[in-house]
């Protein structure tokens, strides 16, 4: 039950939510918004004034703050994309911004720190838990002068434990698939400790929640880092699986830990992957394809989804949707006849129905009839039951209905597509156009007029504007 003090707050949210959701979901969504803003954006739980003296709306301000942090459209309204973000599994520590440090910038005053594993999850062996914790600490030690030593008795700087629901630290867990874990800033007593929700399903794979990834995130808090708004950073608040073999700390997190403790003691300073910025004028794409009206833009470990009916463009890890796929997809196309998409890397390719990978893949690109000299595809596109494959300065054409590579190929790209003089990085088809991407630019090639009708920056498709 809600107290009478919260009634104006709830009425305000009901008004905002009712515009987009049926009556049956209003109360649930209202509770979601209230709980989320209280936990992560410092909305007082006894907040009953809907406006301040200067007329500003407290609820709208907090919603805008949350939307800015996650890169959503800043409306101050609990719309569908905002509610979807609020429902994602995440860390229990409140949000701030940048790779920012914890308020007050607390830090450990020494670089040799101890940790102790107080209990274990039954879902993994003790050895698997110990390995995940050790590897998680090692990420931070490689990037800084910090050294971590495990002890099995006595008082440690950082205590690690699995708890459920209320466990005496004023930050109760909420059961499966909500708040996964939380940690406390450096300090005495509970300071630095990391707690994991015992009701989650912990794994050392891509299934459910990978303990190594969550632990590495929480230890960032234990060392003094707050959440980052960089979606590629380890310190981003929402959980997303990423490939853990040979995982290295992203550059945003390296910058953060070194801002607190200084450079690594290693002779060669570590560098990590940076998250591509959608409106970087030099941005290039690895591959692009349509998918049932959406457009997917692949870059390194990520892809952007452009929705047909919405203005927003959403960025995700490839591994979040397809844990078994490699990063760095090199070519992609949608087969409209079979309602499938095909993704290529090196001499292998995968077939997907919607977002599901079909059994029996990956397969070798030699199945298409390529000579052994072709070991990778630069770009691919489907048009009128034919697939065009671009490799260096040439292209092949495959007959999908008769399933063979057409004779007379490869042909010169510049000869068949006047105005396309450079290597093709990515291409997709809309109506009677091939949208060809080469370097940071894209070329709209009219298949009827047989000429380029527009040249612009490629990331215009990510809603970027230039003067």
From Swiss-Prot:
Residues that coordinate or bind Ca(2+) 1:
157, 189, 191, 193
In this entry the propeptide is located at: 21-100
Which InterPro entries does this one have? Hemopexin-like_dom, Hemopexin-like_dom_sf, Hemopexin-like_repeat, Hemopexin_CS, M10A_MMP, MetalloPept_cat_dom_sf, Pept_M10_metallopeptidase, Pept_M10A
* Superkingdom of the source species: Eukaryota
Q: Where is the signal peptide?
A: 1-20
Start and stop residues of the Hemopexin repeats: 276-325, 326-372, 374-420, 421-464
Glycosylated residue positions = 54, 73, 112, 204, 246
Which positions in this protein are listed as binding Zn(2+) 1?
A: 167, 169, 182, 195
SUPFAM superfamilies referenced in this protein's UniProt entry, alphabetically = Hemopexin-like domain (SSF50923), Metalloproteases ('zincins'), catalytic domain (SSF55486), PGBD-like (SSF47090)
What is the active site of this protein?
218
Q: Example GO biological process term?
A: endodermal cell differentiation
Q: Which residues bind Ca(2+) 2?
A: 174-175, 177, 179, 197, 200
**Subcellular location per the Swiss-Prot or TrEMBL entry:** Cytoplasmic granule; Secreted, Extracellular space, Extracellular matrix
| List of residues binding Zn(2+) 2 | 91, 217, 221, 227
**Motif Cysteine switch per UniProt: ranges:** 89-96
Q: What EC number(s) are associated with this protein in UniProt?
A: 3.4.24.34
Known cofactor(s): Ca(2+); Zn(2+)
Gene Ontology terms, MF aspect = endopeptidase activity; metalloendopeptidase activity; peptidase activity; serine-type endopeptidase activity; tumor necrosis factor binding; zinc ion binding
- Sorted alphabetically, which Pfam families does this protein's record hold? Hemopexin (PF00045), Peptidase_M10 (PF00413), PG_binding_1 (PF01471)
State what inhibits or activates this protein: Cannot be activated without removal of the activation peptide.
Q: What does the entry list under GO cellular component? A: collagen-containing extracellular matrix; extracellular region; extracellular space; specific granule lumen; tertiary granule lumen
The UniProt note on the cofactor reads as follows:
Binds 3 Ca(2+) ions per subunit. Binds 2 Zn(2+) ions per subunit.
Q: Report residues binding Ca(2+) 3.
A: 286, 378, 425
The job of this chain, per UniProt, is described as:
Can degrade fibrillar type I, II, and III collagens.
Q: Which family does it belong to?
A: Belongs to the peptidase M10A family.
Q: What is this protein called?
A: Neutrophil collagenase
Q: What is the lineage of its organism?
A: Eukaryota, Metazoa, Chordata, Craniata, Vertebrata
């Amino acid at each position: 039950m809600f107290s009478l003090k919260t009634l104006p707050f709830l009425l305000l949210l009901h008004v905002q939510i009712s515009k987009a959701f049926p009556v049956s979901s209003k109360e649930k969504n209202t509770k979601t918004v209230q709980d989320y803003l209280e936990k992560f954006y410092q909305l007082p739980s006894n907040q009953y004034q809907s406006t301040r003296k200067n007329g500003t709306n407290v609820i709208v301000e907090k919603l805008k703050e949350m939307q800015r942090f996650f890169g959503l459209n800043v409306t101050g309204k609990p719309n569908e994309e905002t509610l979807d973000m609020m429902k994602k599994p995440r860390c229990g520590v409140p949000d701030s911004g940048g790779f920012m440090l914890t308020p007050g910038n607390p830090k450990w005053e020494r670089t040799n720190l101890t940790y102790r594993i107080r209990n274990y999850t039954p879902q993994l062996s003790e050895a698997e838990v110990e390995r995940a914790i050790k590897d998680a600490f090692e990420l931070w030690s490689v990037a800084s002068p910090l050294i971590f030593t495990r002890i099995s008795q006595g008082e440690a700087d950082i205590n690690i434990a699995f708890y459920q629901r209320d466990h005496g630290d004023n930050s109760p867990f909420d059961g499966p698939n909500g708040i996964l874990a939380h940690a406390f800033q450096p300090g005495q007593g509970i300071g630095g400790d990391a707690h994991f929700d015992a009701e989650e399903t912990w794994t050392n794979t891509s299934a459910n929640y990978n303990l190594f990834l969550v632990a590495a995130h929480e230890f960032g808090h234990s060392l003094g880092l707050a959440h980052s708004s960089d979606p590629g950073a380890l310190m981003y608040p929402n959980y997303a699986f990423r490939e853990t073999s040979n995982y290295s700390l992203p550059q945003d997190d390296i910058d953060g830990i070194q801002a607190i403790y200084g450079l690594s003691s290693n002779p060669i300073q570590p560098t990590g992957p940076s998250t591509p910025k959608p409106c970087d004028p030099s941005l290039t794409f690895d591959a692009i394809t349509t998918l049932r009206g959406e457009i997917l833009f692949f870059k390194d470990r990520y892809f952007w989804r452009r929705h047909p009916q919405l203005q927003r463009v959403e960025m995700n890890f490839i591994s979040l949707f397809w844990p078994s796929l490699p990063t760095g997809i090199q070519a992609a196309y949608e087969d409209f006849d079979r309602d499938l998409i095909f993704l290529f890397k090196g001499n292998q390719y995968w077939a997907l129905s919607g977002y599901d990978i079909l059994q029996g893949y990956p397969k070798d690109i030699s199945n298409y009839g390529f000579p052994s000299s072709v070991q990778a595809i630069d770009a691919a596109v489907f048009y009128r039951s034919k697939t065009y494959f671009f490799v260096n300065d040439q292209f092949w054409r495959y007959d999908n209905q008769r399933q063979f590579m057409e004779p007379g190929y490869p042909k010169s790209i510049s000869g068949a597509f006047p105005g396309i003089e450079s290597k093709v990085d990515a291409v997709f088809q809309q109506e009677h156009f091939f949208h060809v991407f080469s370097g940071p630019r894209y070329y709209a090639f009219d298949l009827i007029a047989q000429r380029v009708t527009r040249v612009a920056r490629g990331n215009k498709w990510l809603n970027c504007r230039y003067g």
